[in-house]
Amino acid sequence: MKLNLKTIALITGFSIVLACTSHHHKKTGMKHQISKQMTAAEILGNPNYLAISYGGYREQSRSIQPSIPQLKEDIKILYAMGIRILRTYNVQPELPHAANVLEAISQLKKEDPSFEMYVMLGAWIDCLHAWTDKTPNHDVESDQNEKEIKRAVVLANKYPSIVKIIAVGNEAMVRWATSYYVQPNVILKYVNYLQNLKKNGELSKDLWITSSDDFSSWGGGDFSYRVQDLEDLIKAVDYVSMHTYAYHNSHYNPSFWKVPDDQLHLSDKQKIDRSIERAIEFTKKQYRDVSEYVKSIDSSKTIHIGETGWATTSNGFYGANGSRATDEYKQGLYHNQLREWTNKEGISCFYFEAFDEHWKDAQNANGSENHFGLFTTKGEAKFPIWNLVDRGIFEGLSRNQHPITKTYDGDYETLMEEVLVPNTEYDR
């Protein structure tokens, strides 16, 4: 199958934007110290400050933490492609990843005063008995939550020029998170706690507080989520961080994924291209649904995307025997069309994610959760950013001593051999 001109223009155009931004910083940014410290209010919604979710784990277990030199290696790669704010997820003492990311950025800033990278610092929230052999109690919180929040406060105060946002919980209110979800009042309690610290001068007044959760948890889906505590939470946060995954819904809510009858005559590639156009419309609708509800509660509140992404390997629901959503071509279309939309509309999108992380489904190497990255664990650039490799954006950079190269050796025809037309007719 051949690349059509529209696809070439989309992928090349977005890559040129990133390339020009990166080369501008390479040519001019290295000579001057940053003239002002950016705030969350100035970063969010700013297309010059692209966002991404980041985990630097290289191995199949988080017990093997990436070193600070390895984190610096990754952060330089992300900086080169125009990323300026990273999202992390937890600050548990046995998992010092986030603290090490902050230290890595701090060191890079000392080495080069023009270096600019910020962090949305996540604090993990659990219910009682989460991740144990006991039945989770979703109406009672874990006694570890308060400690987690306090650790986040310590890091925000230690690195005030880097930490610009604290997110209380990750998908901590959505009911399909059956291992650990809590009720909205728990999130509200800690958001209010952090806001009070800001008022009392114990945290920067410019630090923004949010919670990052599924679109439904923010009132964009099932009306049963629309409770008083959620209304109060919407008023309490500085902005709403919502997650939206057309990729997963290709299996769980596939009405948009099915090839319409009036498109059955199209070529396979045209069917595939149209499927991603529908996926983008699905994403936009979830954003609109959240926005409509949130603004009915607080018209001043902004909504940004805390997570969305597209996996490139799956031996499960989304692979060849399932919805067939999974491959680098579809990831490329989704990523680039998504960035085009969010940049135009002033929506920050913490794209999920930077690098593949194989600890997420350690017993299943081809499980989709391991393969959401724009880069492989070896540092190979996937199809969405092949053009950045062509343009020399990553020249001189490496991951684990591997230079940044393209997946499939850059062979488009070989890649396309694995790209399948969307499927909804399979046993579920």
What are these regions (language model features)?
Residues H25-D74:
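Boundary/entry segment of secreted carbohydrate-active catalytic domains
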Residues L18-A19:
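C-terminal motif of bacterial Sec signal peptides marking the signal peptidase cleavage site
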Residues L86, I166, V240, I305-E307, ...:
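Conserved, mostly hydrophobic/aromatic
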Residues Q70-E94:
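Catalytic domains of carbohydrate-active enzymes, especially glycoside hydrolases
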Residues S142, M173-R175, S179-I305, N315:
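Noncatalytic carbohydrate-binding groove/subsite architecture in carbohydrate-active enzymes
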Residues S63-P66, R87-V101, C127-A130, S142-N145, ...:
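Acidic-and-aromatic substrate-binding clefts and catalytic sites of carbohydrate-active enzymes
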Residues G29-E42, G316-Q337, W341-R428:
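Aromatic-rich peripheral "rim/lid" segments of glycoside hydrolase catalytic domains that contact
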Residues V91, P96-L207:
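Substrate-binding cleft of extracellular glycoside hydrolase catalytic domains
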